[in-house]
């Protein structure tokens, strides 16, 4: 299967989510950077130009990151080819986020988690089979721009 990734939705604007969105911007890929409030999403984007070491090749790359919140911008999920979840390492919170986004997920979208400790089978337990087929773990290491390492874990589907 070959699919071009033209837009990504990064769920979670904390340390990892914001830097992953920034690194996607370094590759010229626009993203929606989601968090529970618009303020947190904006703050995540702002950190891209202030963190050391710098997550962006050029500060202008931050223009490719669009801060979003789940209440006002959830429909943007439907524009994303890849939805990358990078929220806190709690299964109950991840499940809540998945339940919000699944109705907006386009049929060809890939859904992944940046988890480093929750088993894939636990993450997908309540997902429909067609989504399980498109789900995997994509664990970036911190800081993503400098740690050229990505752990990939696929499921049985």
Q: PLM features: residue spans?
A:
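Phosphate-coordination loops involved in phosphoryl transfer and adenosine-cofactor binding
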Residues: 4-7, 62, 80, 108
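Conserved N-terminal Rossmann-fold NAD(P) cofactor-binding segment
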Residues: 30-81, 90-92, 96, 127
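Rossmann-fold dinucleotide-binding core
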Residues: 110-157
């Amino acid at each position: 299967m070959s699919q071009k990734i033209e837009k990504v939705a990064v769920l979670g604007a904390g340390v990892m989510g914001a830097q992953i969105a920034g690194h996607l911007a370094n590759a010229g890929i626009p993203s929606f950077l989601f968090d529970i409030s618009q303020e947190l999403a904006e703050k995540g984007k702002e950190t891209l130009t202030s963190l050391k070491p710098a997550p962006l090749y050029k500060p202008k790359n931050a223009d490719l990151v669009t801060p979003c919140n789940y209440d006002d911008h959830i429909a943007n999920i439907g524009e994303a080819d890849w939805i990358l979840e990078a929220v806190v390492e709690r299964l109950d919170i991840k499940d809540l986020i998945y339940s919000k986004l699944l109705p907006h997920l386009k049929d060809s979208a890939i859904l992944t988690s940046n988890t480093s400790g929750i088993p894939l089978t636990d993450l997908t337990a309540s997902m429909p089979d067609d989504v399980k087929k498109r789900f995997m773990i994509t664990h970036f290491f911190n800081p993503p721009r400098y740690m050229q390492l990505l752990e990939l874990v696929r499921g049985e589907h």
